[in-house]
């Protein structure tokens, strides 16, 4: 149950934890593979891209790269918010996807410098202004992932609305 200081979208937010372990020890095929086990008990594999110039540094491309999981997390966070905002407003939303494209700095630490999020929202009688407001609320107020990434990246959005 929300306390008086929580907004409707906020979950109980306590500390999060995760253990990330390298899977590339002696006798394994993996070079730069990692497995993350989240505090909620889920497992996520990550791997690096092959590096032809420095084979010992590269991965085997067997799982998403760590920065891809960061980008995917931001997409999941904002899509979650948009669907929840629209559903709570009793709008007939039937689908939501977001395609993210990004640019990164050329030099270390190679942070994201630009991220574009192209939303495709499907529903009945949805008004673009309503969906755009839900997207803006997510980016400006609720989505901790995009708000953090916005400290280094210019984040832009687009919307394709599909009537069913």
Predicted regions span which residues?
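Extended beta-strand/beta-hairpin segments
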Residues: 1-72, 83-164
